[in-house]
Amino acid sequence: MSCICLKNEKLNVINQVKRFIKKYCKSTQPLLLALSGGADSLSLFYCLLACRLEGILSFHVAHVDHGWREESAKEATILKNLAEQHQVPYHQLKIDLSQLAGNLEDACRKQRQKFFKEICLQNNLQAVCLGHQENDQVETVLKRILEGSHWSHFDGLKERMWHDQVQFLRPLLGIQKDEILAFLKGNQLKAFEDGTNCDERFMRARMRRTIIPDLNRSFGKKIDNSLVYIASEMSELKNFFLGRVSPLLGQIVKGPFGVYLNLANHPSIDLVEIKYLLRLISEQELFFLSRQILQRASEAIEKLEPQLSFEMGTKKIVIDRGHFFILSKKTACKNPNLQISGSSLQYYGKWMIKTNESFYHQNLQASTWLDGWRGYLKTYLPLDKYVLGQASKHAKLLRHHSTINKWWSSHHVPPFLRSFFPVIWQHNEIAHEFLTGLERQNLQEGEKCLQIELSYLT
């Protein structure tokens, strides 16, 4: 790993990386290279050196010592010396496996991502470069197909992606492993060898050493190009569907209780689009749906079915006549009654209650359940004493013949929401409910009134 003059005879690795960097990167900001010392990341290190030499851009190096192998500490020192030799800023993280719990691979991945993000923010770096190449793409796509993943995941690894406000780039994704090894050999560069890459106890090793070679022999040709083609086609299809549902994604309402989307007013949306949309929203909210639930939920939305729900862990999906909810927690209103009058600031569970005297204007509107979903409710009542509390199904509305439950049903208030928000009582009847936005108090323009505001504290 000494300082050498790179050769590029009949090899296009450097030129492909240069084209990639010019396509996606700004020359004014450095990159961060995740350097393990393996063949892929080492070749990328020297390609980025070539880019720096031509003034295309500069870069930093980040190495993570997982401590999985005895030689890892020695390798970290070698990489540190390599970076210093070429005057490349070097950053290192040593992971203490004894401090991690649960799935070690997942825990280490989160540690790496956190480490990379910190370096990028501290040094104003534009992206993290990863060493994945075409063979990694082939293995990823085949694995997802065999696992029965959703088709939207068949696009495999991305050349460019964002995660947790950090951009990740894969300049080698269109280059085969053989080309990378030839590049290293032609320049007399020796990479570290990770024994786990050949250990068939690991799925990746079995894919590389047994499954894919066996498929090649069985088909009588290499399947690599076919799988890369599938990834490309699925990427185009995914972008098409994303374009179709993007306007709906912009209509999502998020609040302290979860996520809401009204699909009742979009009769032209197809079932396959609904399925993709629900999966996309659910994955963004870390609420992963089984195939059966996804199919049933999508059909319920398409048919505008009432009151369907699914519970998974601490979250819950509710579908009601085309309205789609993901609830983040149980939020039924079970607080003791609260006396309200005059100007005051009080608390009703997680609701902050602010009351003050004001003057009524006809252009003032009371809140609806959608406002409540966002965590804010407001209304205006005649000056008097009231009680804030939970509604009961058979309670009567003040100056109205209907029960509260019939009133809400006639105005299509989703049943599960009715226990989320308090009502205002007076003389054992409900003086105001917040879910329909309808006023029944006959306040006159300019009349002095009691303004009541509820804000949900998260």
From Swiss-Prot:
Main localization, broad class: cytoplasm
Keywords, sorted A to Z: ATP-binding, Cytoplasm, Ligase, Nucleotide-binding, tRNA processing
GO molecular function: ATP binding; tRNA(Ile)-lysidine synthase activity
rRNA processing listed as a keyword: no
Subcellular location: Cytoplasm
Pfam families: ATP_bind_3
Entry keyword Lipoprotein: no
A GO term from the CC aspect: cytoplasm
SUPFAM superfamilies noted in UniProt: Adenine nucleotide alpha hydrolases-like, PheT/TilS domain
Binding site for ATP: S36, G37, G38, A39, D40, S41
EC number assigned by the record: 6.3.4.19
EC class name: ligase
Catalytic activity annotation: cytidine(34) in tRNA(Ile2) + L-lysine + ATP = lysidine(34) in tRNA(Ile2) + AMP + diphosphate + H(+)
Matches recorded under InterPro entries: Rossmann-like_a/b/a_fold, TilS/TtcA_N, tRNA_Ile_lys_synt, tRNA_Ile_lys_synt_N
GO biological process: tRNA modification
UniProt note: domains: The N-terminal region contains the highly conserved SGGXDS motif, predicted to be a P-loop motif involved in ATP binding.
Family from the record: Belongs to the tRNA(Ile)-lysidine synthase family.
Function text: Ligates lysine onto the cytidine present at position 34 of the AUA codon-specific tRNA(Ile) that contains the anticodon CAU, in an ATP-dependent manner. Cytidine is converted to lysidine, thus changing the amino acid specificity of the tRNA from methionine to isoleucine.
Protein name: tRNA(Ile)-lysidine synthase
Origin species: Protochlamydia amoebophila (strain UWE25)
Gene name of this polypeptide: tilS
